[in-house]
Every structure is written in C-alpha cells, then in structure tokens.
Amino acid sequence: MIKNIIKYVGISLFVVFFISACAKKTLNIISKDSLYEKGLEYTLINDIVYKNDTKAIMNITYLNASEPNEYDYKYHEFLIGIYIDDINEGLQNKQYILSMNSNTKYIQIPLKKDHPLYNHIPVKNPYAIYYIIKFKKGLEKTLSLKLSHKKFGNANIIYKRF
C-alpha cells in the first residue's frame, strides 16, 4: 500500500516537473518575435484562381494596425507580397492592378532582404515579391484592397480602418 502511494507520488512529481519545463520552453519560442506576432494578427491572404489554376497570390499585412506608433499618420501602410504565376514580375506586371477603395495611386517601396521588416514577415511566400505600399488616408471606414486582372478576376482583402 505504501509502495503504491510512493509510486503515484513519484509519477505525479515527474509529470508536474515535465509539464512545467515544457511550458517554459514553449512560451519562449512563441514570444520571441513581437513584430511577427503583431503582424500575424493583421495579415490576410487571397488569390486569383482561373479555371482551377492559381494565377496570383497576395498576402497583406496592415502595418498601421500592427505598429500604430511606427507608421505615418497621413498614409495607410501595408506590407504586400505579390506572386504572379508564369512571369513573376510582382506589381511591375501591368496586367495586374492594385487598388484600395478604387484608388490606384500609391507609393511603392520594394522590400529588399536586408530591410528590417523582411525577417519579420508573418506569412512569407518564397516566390512572392514584397513591397511597402502607402495609400493616402481619406475618410474611408473600411480599406478594400484589390488585385485585379481583366481576364482572371480579382482578389479582395478588407480591413477596418485603424
């Protein structure tokens, strides 16, 4: 009887020790990169599919929402990855048009691999070309970003204004 109690206490202590050690390691892994965490919350992905073939993929992180004190109050700023099937020219491909609430005027900054944000991209497509895109702020309550192609259709992503 006493041997059984000692055995159960020993097993219980081992399990408690094992679980507590795992929890600390797991928390350290999860909370290492706060830029990644914040960015992941405001990252959305959509694609253009035509006849069961993916023609383009865009993943967008709304930077103003993820880091409100870091970004320009005059612009809505986005980290955008664009992958276009066949010849991946990103936004240089004139067959695809990027817009926000029908506005096609924006500032485009190519994101190079040595840029500080590059290593914190929440959902990284290795085939995409990345940009920081700035649209001038207006009175809009929602931000509807659209990548469109005349033949293949549209990919839409909608954010609430921050």
Regions found by a protein language model. Give the residues of each.
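Sec-dependent bacterial lipoprotein signal peptides
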Residues: M1-C22
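Conserved functional micro-motifs across diverse proteins
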Residues: C22-F162
